[in-house]
């Protein structure tokens, strides 16, 4: 089955690259709510076009609306987490293609992972593969600033999941990422002399 999936993805490589290019050229830093809405719209359209699945877009007070869709049936659920915001301001990085590589804002973190997730579902559907589980996907728009608006939604979706995986693309040499260092923010106040 693995070879069948790989052959399918290789056959559709040009389309996969076009989908990644579409999302990368739709730039949006976490702080640009209007640009985030445009990226989210492109993402929802791409999910529908490629997988045939409908998306649910959560309302979020500050506009960082998470997008959810699912595929498959079964008792067990696997949750896939990703984000469509980038840390870079619009125009900070240029998009370019070189050999079989794409470069630009969000290619590596994490639009490559979003496109991989979407094409995984498309491959399963087109090849008639039943994952035997419910695959649920949640993509947020505020990850780069700590997921303040979406963390509660993600935690709620994770409660009944057998496993949760982040759609982080592999490293440059193809290794799977299984952990990361994380981030801590704190304030230190000093009084006195």
Would you name each region that the model predicts?
Residues 1-5, 55, 83-88, 136-154:
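Short, charge-rich amphipathic segments
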Residues 2-107, 126, 131:
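Acidic/His- and Gly-rich active-site-bordering loop/insert found
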Residues 98-99, 112, 116-119, 126-193:
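Fold-level recognition of mixed alpha/beta catalytic cores in primary-metabolism enzymes, strongest
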Residues 8-9, 24, 40, 54, ...:
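Sparse, context-dependent recognition of short Cys/His-centered cofactor- or disulfide-binding micro-motifs
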């Amino acid at each position: 089955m693995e070879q069948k999936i790989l052959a399918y993805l290789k056959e559709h490589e040009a389309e996969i690259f076009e989908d990644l290019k579409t999302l990368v050229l739709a730039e949006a830093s976490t702080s640009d709510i209007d640009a985030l809405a445009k990226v989210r719209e492109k993402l929802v359209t791409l999910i529908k076009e490629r997988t045939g699945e409908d998306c649910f877009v959560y309302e979020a007070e500050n506009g960082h609306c998470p997008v959810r869709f699912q595929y498959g049936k079964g008792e067990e659920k696997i949750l896939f987490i990703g984000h469509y915001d980038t840390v870079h301001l619009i125009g900070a990085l240029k998009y370019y293609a070189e050999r079989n590589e794409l470069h630009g804002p969000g290619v590596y973190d994490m639009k490559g992972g979003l496109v991989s997730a979407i094409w995984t579902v498309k491959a399963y559907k087109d090849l008639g593969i039943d994952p035997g589980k419910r695959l649920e996907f949640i993509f947020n728009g505020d990850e780069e600033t700590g997921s303040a608006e979406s963390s509660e939604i993600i935690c709620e979706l994770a409660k009944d999941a057998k496993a949760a995986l982040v759609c982080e693309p592999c490293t440059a040499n193809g290794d799977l990422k299984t952990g990361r260092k994380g981030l801590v923010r704190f304030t230190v106040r000093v009084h006195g002399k």
